[in-house]
UniProtKB/Swiss-Prot annotation:
Keyword Lipid biosynthesis applies: no
Membrane topology classification: Peripheral membrane protein
Ligand binding (ATP): 151-158
Organism of derivation: Bradyrhizobium diazoefficiens (strain JCM 10833 / BCRC 13528 / IAM 13628 / NBRC 14792 / USDA 110)
Protein's cellular compartments: Cell inner membrane
Biological role: Produces ATP from ADP in the presence of a proton gradient across the membrane. The catalytic sites are hosted primarily by the beta subunits.
EC number(s) given by UniProt: 7.1.2.2
Catalytic activity: ATP + H2O + 4 H(+)(in) = ADP + phosphate + 5 H(+)(out)
Protein name (record): ATP synthase subunit beta
Lineage: Bacteria, Pseudomonadati, Pseudomonadota, Alphaproteobacteria, Hyphomicrobiales
Amino acid sequence: MAAQSGRVTQVIGAVVDVQFEGHLPAILNSLETKNGGNRLVLEVAQHLGESTVRTIAMDTTEGLVRGQEVTDTGSPIRVPVGEGTLGRIINVIGEPIDEAGPVKSEGLRAIHQEAPTYTDQSTEAEILVTGIKVVDLLAPYAKGGKIGLFGGAGVGKTVLIQELINNVAKAHGGYSVFAGVGERTREGNDLYHEFIESKVNADPHNPDPSVKSKCALVFGQMNEPPGARARVALTGLTIAEDFRDKGQDVLFFVDNIFRFTQAGSEVSALLGRIPSAVGYQPTLATDMGALQERITTTQKGSITSVQAIYVPADDLTDPAPATSFAHLDATTTLSRSIAEKGIYPAVDPLDSTSRMLSPLVVGEEHYAVARQVQQVLQRYKALQDIIAILGMDELSEEDKLTVARARKVERFMSQPFHVAEIFTGSPGKFVDLADTIKGFKGLVEGKYDHLPEAAFYMVGTIEEAVEKGKKLAAEAA
């Protein structure tokens, strides 16, 4: 059957209406036209009446004119997959945007796929060690699970994601896919160059045969129209699914999943849907479910996904972050009040949760230490009002000791990052799980009550804290 062609009848920002004679293209099909010499891809979103489809443009529509010819490709948007994508930057429609020539792909795959069936899914529970103390102890990540990083603007979500890529890619050596959804282009550019410098990826312009690229980058950043931002997460996921189906354990990073929802909401109004709570699209839960249900572990391989989730105005009850919560195995909440104390990563130890923190998965000792740490911090939180009104002197001896230990625990949760070496000047630390448990266990049992608080700030293992304590004592003397 020859490719169907139609004509543009109306352009409203990112939404384009196309009229076809006879057979209408299916919903989610991709249509193509030329705009200023460039290929413009439109995705069918609605059928209007007998002969018109309403589509969402994947690029800017400036310069489109009514009557212009549009061709139906007969399938959804298809993107290159396989090892040829590693080390490359591609956009939502699979075109390379790193000026390093065409992508050597092993074939094309449609970005809209069915989620794996129940029978295909794997149910094993295994922990993914990240080398970040506060995460591994209190909200451990599941291998093949979904992890959400919640936080307002500027509390360190992107830095934490970069550290995870660095630690986990180096520790387990698998492939990663990074989807930049509606975030700053500058950060995407920095990430690309950091990957080349840290040898996670080879430089496509200047290949070094000793470096094998481990991460594919897919970007649809803030300057892109909403169509691209609403679909780029699916493009990244399609590449990750292909690696998984070939038996790989893949890491899939999305920065930022809120922008995926935001783009959907921008398009929704243009498509004429009546908005729901807080102006979001009525299909919010469906859109989120369609993406999240595909991120799963099958009998063949696993996808472990880490998603940064921007929280508008620090309000966790906003429909966008609240809808994401339902899908996650672990949540890491970054708190502004902790960042203000200078404690980085600014992970809130009482607000971060994980399905994996169970004695059956992590073992009795780990579970007991994690609960003791949370107990000490919870008690400290309860005493803060009394301290603010009456001061430390009014507390009982037992409470004074609890406060002192809690402050040390808080500081011991900070840790120098490899990716932050550039601006902190201190070398990054990867802390093994056994060392993390040992350190916090000693702290809550009172083994280190004699050391000053400052000894625990920005160190890796407890041995480093003891060394730092000795140094501080020598300097004070």
